């Protein structure tokens, strides 16, 4: 699958998420990021926002549940081979087709957008001592690892080619692009995030 333009996507995603930082006034209906994390409820709301983003049709609301991933796995019976539909093109693994490529770009962008939201929560935990924060940190680390894992399996070589370049593993909210890590490095970071998350969530029970 053709590599996604990482630098451009990262800039667009992070600019969108950080837009409120460039405003000196509060806009009705928009919550300033600094104010969002002033209290425990703000963290809960932000966490719920991450889960809502994961439920989007570009992620687990469709494409990564029963949509694109099932189509490229050819789990659907293709009874319309004579018709040029997006489904048949995806079924045939025509990744560069003008109808298929937007699906791929949307998955990539939405996944990193959601990772950025999770990282925003994680970056703002420091300096607060709300009782719920260990559980929130554990959940957001899990989300970050989970999304990177799905991006890795879709857009990178398998672990047998562990030294090859894979995807960026993004660990902080930033508008700066992140260089790609190797397949092995991404797996190591996934395991590290999940290991910490397991301890936090176990102790939060």
Give the ranges of each region predicted by the language model:
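Secretory-pathway/luminal and periplasmic proteins that interact with or process carbohydrate-rich
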Residues: 55-60, 75-76, 147-158
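Membrane-proximal, proline-rich intrinsically disordered regions
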Residues: 20-67
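Short coil/linker segments at helix-helix boundaries
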Residues: 154-192
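Sec-dependent bacterial lipoprotein signal peptides
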Residues: 1-20
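Acidic helix-start/capping segments at beta-turn-to-alpha-helix junctions
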Residues: 67-74, 136, 142-143, 170
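An acidic, Gly/Ser/Thr/Pro-rich helix-cap/linker signature
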Residues: 64-81, 85-86
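Conserved, well-structured interaction surfaces
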Residues: 84-154, 176, 181-182, 198-204
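Extracytoplasmic/secreted envelope proteins and their assembly/folding machinery
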Residues: 44-47, 51, 112-115, 119-122, ...
């Amino acid at each position: 699958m053709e590599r996604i333009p990482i630098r451009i996507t990262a800039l667009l995603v992070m600019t969108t998420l950080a837009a409120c930082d460039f405003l000196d006034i509060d806009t009705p209906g928009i919550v300033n990021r600094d104010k969002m994390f002033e209290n425990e409820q703000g963290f809960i709301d932000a966490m719920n926002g991450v889960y809502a983003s994961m439920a989007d049709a570009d992620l687990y609301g469709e494409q990564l549940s029963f949509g694109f991933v099932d189509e490229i796995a050819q789990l659907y019976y293709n009874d319309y081979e004579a018709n040029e539909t997006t489904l048949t093109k995806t079924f045939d693994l025509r990744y560069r087709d003008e109808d298929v490529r937007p699906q791929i770009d949307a998955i990539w962008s939405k996944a990193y957008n959601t990772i950025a939201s999770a990282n925003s929560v994680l970056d703002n935990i420091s300096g607060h001592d709300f009782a719920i924060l260990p559980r929130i940190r554990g959940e957001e680390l899990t989300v970050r690892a989970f999304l990177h894992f799905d991006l890795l399996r879709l857009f990178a070589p398998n672990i047998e080619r562990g030294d090859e370049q894979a995807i960026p593993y993004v660990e902080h909210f930033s508008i700066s692009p992140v260089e790609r890590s190797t397949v092995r490095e991404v797996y190591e970071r996934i395991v590290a995030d999940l290991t910490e998350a397991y301890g936090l969530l176990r102790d939060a029970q």
